[in-house]
Amino acid sequence: EGLDFVHNLLGGRCSRMVADSSEGDVVAFLAWKGRLDEMQDLAEECCDRLAAAGLDGWLILGQNLATTADVRRGYLTMCACQADALRIWPGRRWFSLEQMAFTAACREILEKGEAETQQRLAVLPWLREGTETDLFGTLCVYYLDAGSSLSKTAEQLYVHKNTVKYRIQQVEQRLGYRVDQQPEAIELYTACALVRLLGETTLGQSDNALPDTSDFTP
C-alpha cells in the first residue's frame, strides 16, 4: 500500500524514479531537479496525504548519494536513528539524512559514558543558576522545534515574542556569545538534543544541577 502511494504521488513529479519496499520501509530514488523549497513543499504534501490515507510513517530526505555504499550507509543510519530523532524533534514529520547523522553522533556521545555526556552538558548550570526563568527550555524550543524563529518559539510556548527575545538575550548575556554564532551554537544545539535524548522533560526547572546520567544506559 505504501509503495503504491509513493508511485502515485511521486511518479509524475520527476523525470525518473525507482522505488521499492524493504523491511517495511519504502525507498525511492528520484531524478529531481527542482528547487529546495519545492522539495520541502513536496515532503509536506506527502506527509499530509499519508495522514489523510490513514498511513503512519515519516519521510527521510537525502541528496548527493554518489555510490551504493553511500546509499547503504544512509539507509542503515536512518533505520538505527528514527526513534532517537523523534525524541530530539518530537512531532516532526520528515527529516534530512544530515539530521539522522547528527542524531547518530548524539547517541555516540551518550554511549561514551557519563564523563563525556556531562562535559557536553556543562553549559546547563550557567543557564539555570540564579533564575526561575526557563532559559534552557526556551533555547531547546528555539533550536529544535521552531527553526531558530522567535515568533514560532513564542507560539509554541504561548508567550509574547518579546518574552522569547528577552530570554534569548539573557542566554547570550550569560554565555558571552550569540546563540546563532558559529561554532559556539553547535555545542548549544548538541546540548539541547542530548537533554531530550536523556528524557529530561522538565527543561525549565531552576535548579543548577546537570541531568543525572549515572544510571543512564544507552
Please tell me what each predicted stretch does.
Residues 1-218:
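Cytosolic nucleotide-utilizing catalytic cores of signal-transduction proteins
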